[in-house]
Structure formats: C-alpha cells, structure tokens
C-alpha cells in the first residue's frame, strides 16, 4: 500500500456571483495546538485547484473548525481578497486560449 497523508478537514465555499469555488483544508498540529490551513480556488469548469494561501495558522477546536474556516473565507471574500486570483486566472485562461489558437494556425 502506498503511504498516504491525512489532509485533515476540508470545506468548500461557492463564491457568490462567480463561477468559482474556494476550498480550505486544515490539519491539526499537536505541537502548536493550532490548525495549519491551505486555501485553493477553482473555476467550476476547470479541474485544477490553484493554491492561493499556504499555511495560515488558525486557533480553533475540532467542534468548530469548519465554522471558523467558513468565517475566514467569508471575511476574505468581503474584503475582495479573491478578486485578484479570479482576475489572474481569467487572464491565464485567455493566454492559454491564444496559445492554442497560435499552435493550431501554425499547422
């Protein structure tokens, strides 16, 4: 059997008025008594998760970690945090589409 890593608790939140979903994963650290999180964004029609925040440390407990993660994502959304990543992703997709067009027309 291959060795696996427990990725802990994961939630997803659909961002209002967009085609994007944010995933947040949290792993509990016994050493610091905190959760270490990773934040990803994905457009619904593309299967690639894009890491946007790595190793945010969150003080919480097992019974409320999901709620606390949802609160964190909501706070970030209300401050416009995800706008940059959405704009960047849209730009990358346009560049990719243009590259495909160039390659297809070269043949």
Question: Where are the language model's segments positioned?
Answer:
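Mixed-charge, Lys/Arg-enriched low-complexity segments
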Residues: 48-107
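Negatively charged, low-complexity tracts enriched in Asp/Glu with abundant Ser/Thr
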Residues: 1-19, 25
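Hydrophobic residues embedded in beta-strands of well-ordered beta-sheets
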Residues: 33-37, 47, 63
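Short, low-complexity interaction segments enriched in Ser/Thr/Pro/Gly
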Residues: 11-14, 41, 91, 95
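Short linear proline/tyrosine/threonine-rich motifs used for host-factor recruitment
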Residues: 13, 23-24, 35-42
């Amino acid at each position: 059997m291959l060795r696996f890593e427990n990725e802990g608790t994961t939630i997803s939140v659909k961002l209002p008025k967009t085609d994007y979903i944010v995933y947040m994963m949290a792993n509990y650290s016994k050493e610091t008594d905190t959760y270490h999180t990773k934040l990803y964004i994905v457009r619904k029609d593309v299967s690639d998760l894009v890491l946007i925040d790595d190793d945010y440390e969150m003080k919480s407990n097992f019974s409320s970690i999901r709620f606390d993660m949802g609160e964190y994502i909501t706070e970030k959304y209300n401050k416009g945090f995800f706008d940059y990543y959405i704009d960047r992703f849209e730009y990358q997709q346009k560049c990719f589409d243009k590259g495909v067009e160039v390659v297809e027309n070269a043949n």
